[in-house]
């Protein structure tokens, strides 16, 4: 039997076209960098950078951008055997704007449909999914068929064995559903129902406060964590932005960890670095607080850099950031130049 993967992720992939100039709206940007993108794909890259054997289950268009994504996955050491092409739809492209420290608008081009939503249950290698030490899926994978059925089939095949992570990953623009059925009901009833179904098969849930509210109806961090545990997971990880991260385990242990100081260049991708480091720490068997500190540091490093996938840190960089107590930008994914001021010099 083939050696099990440390981490298999399933879901979104695409090409990130990010400005090489900060502080400018897209209408004024004239230089872009091209990068591998898609949250679960970035998580696989992040875990691979930390020495883990990883693979991605997803689909691209049958086009030049799809070929580029295969090339990038191989260069990052991520197995692409389950990345297949869809002839009908183009590979998605995502643009962003960069307004540090906390404004990074995203523009997704996934019409008429993203190939990664065309994953079919019949195409899954369920033996590999079952045997992986960590299986990582996302909320976006539940937003449309056949991806939703395939994702739930993978979760059922896992049968809560090993570490099964549900990244709540709430992207409302990807969902098509009617307005809430009742005034006192959830704002997105179809999404909430699918999230509850997935949580019943997961052992770990990860999300920010907005995502936790979709999954549980709770926004207060401790209440959200308790609701995630009640939904079935063993470990609830609630990301609180500038307030850090809260992790609550079913065994009663709690880790409320502040963020690592960082001068933010691009906050996009920090959560994916956090996810890859979370997988790494869980596989290493570390105690919860140590995992959260390590994952926070990995995320902070990526936030100090321009790109997402190519900015994922190596172990020595994470350890150096933890030792220094701050994250710097040294390494791949360099900082973009600042937008010109009125005098024409960089701000």
What residue spans do the PLM features occupy?
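A short, aliphatic-rich alpha-helical micro-motif
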Residues: 2, 126-130, 198-199
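Short, conserved phosphate/pyrophosphate- and ester-handling motifs at nucleotide-, phospho-/glycolipid
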Residues: 47, 208, 271
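Glycine-centered short loops/turns at secondary-structure junctions
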Residues: 51, 77, 161-162, 232, ...
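Conserved N-terminal subdomain of the carbohydrate kinase-like
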Residues: 53-139, 320-347
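Hydrophobic anchor at the start of a short beta-strand
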Residues: 53-54, 80, 162-164, 236
């Amino acid at each position: 039997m083939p050696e099990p993967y440390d981490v298999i992720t399933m879901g979104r992939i695409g090409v990130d076209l990010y400005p090489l100039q900060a502080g400018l709206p897209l209408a004024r940007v004239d230089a872009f960098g091209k990068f591998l993108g898609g949250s679960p794909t970035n998580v696989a890259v992040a875990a691979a950078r930390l020495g883990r054997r990883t693979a991605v289950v997803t689909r691209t268009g049958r086009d030049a951008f799809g070929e580029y994504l295969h090339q990038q996955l191989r260069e990052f050491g991520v197995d692409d055997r389950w990345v297949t092409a869809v002839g009908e739809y183009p590979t998605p492209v995502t643009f962003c704007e960069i307004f540090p420290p906390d404004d990074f608008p995203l523009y997704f081009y996934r019409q008429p449909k993203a190939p990664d939503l065309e994953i079919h249950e019949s195409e899954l290698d369920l033996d590999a999914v079952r045997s992986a030490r960590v299986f990582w899926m996302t909320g976006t994978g539940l937003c449309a068929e056949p991806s939703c059925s395939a994702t739930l089939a993978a979760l059922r095949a896992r049968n809560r064995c090993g570490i099964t992570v549900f990244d709540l990953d709430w992207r409302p623009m990807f969902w098509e559903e009617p307005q809430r059925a009742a005034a006192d009901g959830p704002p997105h009833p179809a999404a909430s129902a699918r999230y509850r179904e997935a949580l019943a098969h997961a052992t770990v849930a990860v999300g920010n406060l907005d995502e936790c509210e979709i999954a549980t109806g709770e926004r207060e961090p401790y209440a959200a964590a308790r609701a995630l545990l009640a939904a079935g997971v063993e470990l609830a990880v609630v990301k609180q932005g500038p307030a850090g991260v809260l992790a609550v385990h079913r065994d009663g242990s709690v880790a409320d960890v502040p963020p690592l100081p960082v001068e933010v260049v691009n906050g996009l991708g920090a959560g994916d670095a956090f996810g890859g480091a979370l997988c790494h720490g869980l596989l290493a068997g570390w105690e919860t607080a140590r995992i959260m500190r390590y994952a926070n540091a990995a995320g902070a490093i990526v936030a100090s850099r321009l790109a997402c996938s190519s900015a994922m840190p190596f172990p020595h960089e994470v350890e150096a950031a933890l030792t220094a107590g701050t994250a710097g930008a040294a390494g791949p994914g360099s900082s973009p130049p600042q937008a010109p001021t009125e005098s024409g010099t960089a701000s």
